[in-house]
Amino acid sequence: MIQMQTNLDVADNSGARRVMCIKVLGGSKRRYATVGDIIVVSVKEAIPRGKVKKGDVMKAVVVRVAKDIRRADGSVIRFDRNAAVLVNNQSEPVGTRIFGPVPRELRAKNHMKIISLAPEVL
């Protein structure tokens, strides 16, 4: 569960290393985001010569959350850290590679490009 002020790792090669959620998109009273949701983030830490720089405000798709994700078959999946992938206004990834596993819940939210770039889908 991601809310405002939550720090996330960046799971792509866009140049950002850490981002902070500044808004959860999807309604004025929406408080939490989970896997597959789009949030607005501020880049807090970036590498030199990356596509993004510190202070940039961008959209991101949440790909990993530390909170349990319940599935219809009763199984539960959770990750060690919160992570996101930076996207542009058309919801296409800014980076060209995705690092680490992503859950298959992204498929239901139509983030097929992220699914295809990911090395492992859980």
UniProtKB/Swiss-Prot annotation:
InterPro entries: Ribosomal_uL14, Ribosomal_uL14_bac-type, Ribosomal_uL14_CS, Ribosomal_uL14_sf. One of its GO terms (biological process) is translation. Disulfide bonds: none annotated. One of its GO terms (molecular function) is structural constituent of ribosome. It comes from the Bacteria. SMART domains: Ribosomal_L14 (SM01374). Keywords: Ribonucleoprotein, Ribosomal protein, RNA-binding, rRNA-binding. The keyword Transmembrane helix does not apply. One of its GO terms (cellular component) is cytosolic large ribosomal subunit. NCBIfam families: rplN_bact (TIGR01067). Binds to 23S rRNA. Forms part of two intersubunit bridges in the 70S ribosome. Part of the 50S ribosomal subunit. Forms a cluster with proteins L3 and L19. In the 70S ribosome, L14 and L19 interact and together make contacts with the 16S rRNA in bridges B5 and B8. Belongs to the universal ribosomal protein uL14 family. This is Large ribosomal subunit protein uL14.
